[in-house]
């Protein structure tokens, strides 16, 4: 089972989510991901976009480091997707150093 770590940016985004239904769905998807079931994920430039088909279309961006580590970079929804991807790339670059 891979270890799951959260960046400060992800933790802040998640703590500000008010929709408990969204939080529950995100938690389930991350749990499934930790068990090897990535589900609806799109990869670009080494970054994964976990797509949650609920509400405004929540997204969780992550890095996968081998079979032992998944780093949750940041989150958002379909309306903030472009800026969230840019943020995820910046945060991922810090982890690659």
Where are these regions (language model features)?
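Basic, Lys/Arg-enriched alpha-helical interface segments
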Residues: 1-57, 65-70, 77-97
């Amino acid at each position: 089972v891979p270890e799951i770590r959260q960046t400060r940016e992800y933790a802040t985004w998640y703590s500000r989510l008010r929709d408990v239904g969204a939080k529950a769905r995100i938690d389930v998807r991350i749990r499934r991901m930790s068990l090897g079931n990535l589900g609806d994920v799109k990869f670009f430039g080494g970054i994964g976009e976990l797509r949650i088909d609920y509400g405004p279309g929540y997204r969780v961006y992550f890095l996968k480091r081998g079979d032992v580590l998944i780093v949750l970079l940041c989150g958002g929804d379909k309306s903030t997707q472009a800026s969230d991807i840019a943020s995820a790339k910046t945060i991922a670059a810090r982890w690659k150093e």
